[in-house]
Amino acid sequence: MATIKVKQVKSRIKCPKDQKRTLDALGLRKMNQIVEHEANPAILGMVEKVKHLVSVEK
């Protein structure tokens, strides 16, 4: 499968708890942190949930 790079571009402060947990599950804990994941449906669903906080590169 293809891989995607996910970068946190906005702060998690004042976000609902479920969105904070989603960022944790993606491995994003700090601003401007980049993680690489396989583009499977589970990861893409998590990215969709926090799309206003992250940017995605293929």
UniProtKB/Swiss-Prot annotation:
SUPFAM superfamilies: Ribosomal protein L30p/L7e. PROSITE patterns: RIBOSOMAL_L30. The keyword Ribosomal protein applies. GO terms for biological process: translation. Keywords: Ribonucleoprotein, Ribosomal protein. Belongs to the universal ribosomal protein uL30 family. Part of the 50S ribosomal subunit. This is Large ribosomal subunit protein uL30.
